[in-house]
Amino acid sequence: MLHKIEKWIDQTNFEYKQQRICCAKFFSEFEGFYPLAFLEQAYFVVVDEIPKPDFPELRQMGFGSFMDMQAGGITYKDTYNVSSLRLHFHELVHVAQWAHLGAHGFILRYMDEIQTFGYHESPLEKMAYALDANFSEGGAKINIPSYVVRNI
């Protein structure tokens, strides 16, 4: 299943490759949180509908509600898809998580957390929401990729 999901992710990222925008454009907004070198290796695509791998096997494993959830963004490796520009900070946390855990590590952990805790209580999501809240509320600047490595 992991290989099927990763193949779908790679195909999805390939299909949007021409529309990808480099996140380095956010360096001044996110300075102190995300190093320029990290942002230069992260991309986003603004889409009308968030792409998800709607495989019957995922539904059989209990991911139906996650698949049907109206998400504002989702991250696949170094690229995230957003329906709103507001979600960049949150999705960049997930880019850092993917980079640290690797494709299989992230997919396995994310699936396990969704099944065990549900979306809103999953540790990877809670980390992203907490860091996003810190940024939105003008909190202390934190090097996000380093924070992810230390706290994941």
Where are these regions (language model features)?
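A short, surface-exposed helix-loop junction/capping segment
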Residues: 2-16
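Auxiliary, metal-adjacent structural segments of Zn-dependent hydrolase domains
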Residues: 17-74, 78, 130
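Hydrophobic (often cysteine-bearing) scaffold residues that line and stabilize catalytic clefts
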Residues: 22, 26, 85, 120, ...
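Sec/Tat-exported extracytoplasmic proteins
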Residues: 34, 100, 132-135, 139
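Post-HEXXH active-site segment of zinc metalloproteases
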Residues: 69, 98-130, 146
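Active-site recognition of the HExxH zinc-binding catalytic motif
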Residues: 86, 90-98
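Long, well-structured alpha-helical subdomains associated
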Residues: 138-152
